[in-house]
Amino acid sequence: MLDVVALLLIALAVGFWFVRTRYSYWTRRGIGSEPARFPVGNMEGFRKNKHFIDIVTPIYEKFKGNGAPFAGFFMMLRPVVLVTDLELAKQILIQDFANFEDRGMYHNERDDPLTGHLFRIDGPKWRPLRQKMSPTFTSAKMKYMFPTVCEVGEELTQVCGELADNAMCGILEIGDLMARYTSDVIGRCAFGVECNGLRNPEAEFAIMGRRAFSERRHCKLVDGFIESFPEVARFLRMRQIHQDITDFYVGIVRETVKQREEQGIVRSDFMNLLIEMKQRGELTIEEMAAQAFIFFAAGFDTSASTLGFALYELAKQPALQAKLREEIDQALRLHNGEFTYDSMQELRYMELVIAETLRKYPILPQLTRISRHLYAAKGDRHFYIEPGQMLLIPVYGIHHDPALYPEPHKFIPERFLADQLAQRPTAAWLPFGDGPRNCIGMRFGKMQTTIGLVSLLRNFHFSVCPRTDPKIEFLKSNILLCPANGIYLKVQQLSQMSS
């Protein structure tokens, strides 16, 4: 009995020593950091009463400009580099990219196939896969998909009008409507299927899309473990995505492939590219589903939230809304009343509005990278980064830094005029990342967002109402930025306002 007690005491002492030593890592190196608590490190309250930005942004604000190019924090027991210097961020993403190719995110192609997509995979797989998928996102392919997205935009206009006519005082929850629009767009462009989400909120494709982002397979502590120690989680064959969601997307891809191959259907879309890769033996059905899923994931929640945030800000500032609407109307007049791919390129103020929306609400509010080798930050050996160490670039904190964007809480599209852009470092705006691993679907996302805004603003006026939150609160359980309480706006048809 005494031997057992002695062993337990020794184990506790060793554990205490290990935790204390681990949590003194940054202090021993002379790097600024906040005190950590076992077992969550600096992640206390994460996904409960704090969003990730609520944890990271104060650390960025406290330690930026203190002489070191980064601060330290802990994801559970894992010490993570928090980049506070924009020149270092640029070096990580662009100049020294070869050392920071990997994102260090959880992926498990064997047991959790939908996680094996381009955004998550690391090592030798990601570069050839990106090169093969890049042709889908060229300007020529965007021009080809433009009419399809516009068709969904027209349906969005019809559905929005019907909902506004039937709603009490014309008040609509915009976020869900935007999600149904983006799910229909991506269903057609990525999966080659008609989703009918706009007409039917209970359409399976739209429901599965919402579930893929909102439902957690595990409790917060287990999720935190998977995200903090992805290699260990992969070794333990842990999974993040519910099986029925995986089965749904794999099933859609399998059925689409079978139909196209049997009927000889060839389209210039994303699914056709995946089929060609499968026929060359480069992808399995499960791997195809993972790539189609990330097309969906990257365009569904991100573009839907961006549309909602943009309409929210335009509703709060009617003068900006009127200015953007006038630009849209002028572009239509110059093109005989038609909205074309060329006329979309002429919407300069639209570009400013979208850029400022993504500045204030970067949907992915942080970027992660892994250092492959020992690295001296900015050439200073004192500020070294160890091999295998995770780095985090706090996009939200950078975008809300008053030294870069005075009065960052205000929505000012003119921040992105050429003369103001020239005054800021290139790493001051990172909604799509930067460098060789920037967002591959950036063009598609911008096009989808632009068409959505054009479809709505040429037909409707948006204004705040008693249910509009004065400030958007973010859903704490989501690593992305999305509204916790929806976005309620009053929607009026322009034709009825002028009559």
Swiss-Prot record:
What's a single GO MF annotation on this record?
oxidoreductase activity, acting on paired donors, with incorporation or reduction of molecular oxygen
Entry keyword Oxidoreductase: yes
One GO cellular component this record assigns the protein to is: endoplasmic reticulum membrane
- Which EC number(s) are documented for this chain? 1.14.-.-
Gene3D superfamilies named in the record:
Cytochrome P450
Per its Swiss-Prot or TrEMBL entry, what cofactor is needed?
heme
In terms of one coarse class, where is the protein primarily found? endoplasmic reticulum
Q: Which residues bind heme?
A: C439
User: Keyword Iron, does the record have it?
Assistant: yes
Checking Pfam families in the record gives: p450
Membrane topology per the entry is: Peripheral membrane protein
Compartments, as annotated in UniProt: Endoplasmic reticulum membrane; Microsome membrane
Swiss-Prot/TrEMBL keywords: Endoplasmic reticulum, Heme, Iron, Membrane, Metal-binding, Microsome, Monooxygenase, Oxidoreductase
Which family does the UniProt entry place this protein in? Belongs to the cytochrome P450 family.
What does the UniProt record say this protein does? May be involved in the metabolism of insect hormones and in the breakdown of synthetic insecticides.
Can you say what this protein is called? Cytochrome P450 6a22
Give the originating organism.
Drosophila melanogaster (Fruit fly)
Q: What is this organism's lineage?
A: Eukaryota, Metazoa, Ecdysozoa, Arthropoda, Hexapoda
Query: What gene does this protein come from?
Result: Cyp6a22
